[in-house]
A protein has these predicted regions:
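Residue-level detector of structural "landmarks"
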Residues: 1-4
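Intrinsic disorder/low-complexity segments in short proteins, especially the signal peptide
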Residues: 8-10
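Short hydrophobic alpha-helical segments enriched in small aliphatic residues
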Residues: 12-15
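Active-site-adjacent structural elements in enzyme catalytic cores
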Residues: 20-206
């Protein structure tokens, strides 16, 4: 690589980092079992307009964006510094929300759904056309989870959207189990952090 190309690449990276870190991140504390409806509604509105909200799940904190909005999903990759070919997981808040985002639910998958959802189990399905390629990393399949955490379920339900959400940390860093961990990596890069205390499991879903 020539010096000119190297300098241009470095400048592009710096501009991307600066562009990603220009907002004030809102921090809201929520009761992990009975989250305040007004705070949840605030987070849901951010998601609807294409913003990013970090929220607790039973496993780790997730970084959520509108899973049907390609630009919002690209924002997740940018905030985390995550390779765009590394697929995201779509989160739903009830079983009926699965059918619109997948082409089919095999009988074997339905048995697992009946046994383990809601909970820390991520499943892979053939994706429906409505799911953007930015979610799946260009694959024909999509990962879906139905979390059991009250804050996560309330946020998804209030937004009326499948929420694309990897762990809410900088790529390559440990997965966050507290809001303070999220803030350390992503403060200024995302719109909101919902602080629901420590994640129960502390490990990402299967």
């Amino acid at each position: 690589m020539t010096l000119a190309l190297a300098a241009a690449a470095k400048n592009t990276k710096n501009v991307a980092e600066q562009t990603c870190k220009i907002m004030k991140t809102i921090l809201r504390k929520v009761d992990p079992q009975q989250p305040d409806a007004a705070i949840i509604a605030e987070g849901a509105e951010i998601l609807k307009r294409g913003g990013l909200v970090a929220f607790p799940t039973e496993t780790v904190y997730g970084l959520g964006g509108n899973g049907l909005d390609s630009e919002a999903c690209k924002g997740i990759y940018l905030a985390k510094g995550r390779p765009s070919d590394n697929p995201l997981i779509l989160h739903i808040s009830q079983i009926s929300e699965l059918r619109p985002i997948v082409r089919e639910v095999p009988a074997a998958a339905q048995k697992l759904i009946d046994a383990f959802w809601p909970g820390p189990l991520t499943m892979i399905f053939p994706k429906a056309d409505i799911v953007p390629d930015s979610v799946t990393g260009g694959l024909d399949t999509v990962a879906v989870r139905f979390p059991s955490h009250p804050v996560a379920m309330a946020l998804i339900r209030a937004s009326g959207l499948p929420i694309a959400a990897p762990s809410a940390n900088a790529s390559g860093k440990p997965s966050p189990t507290r809001a303070s961990h999220v803030a350390f990596d992503l403060d200024g890069k995302i719109d909101m952090i919902l602080d629901g205390g420590a994640a129960e499991w502390g490990l990402e879903s299967t």
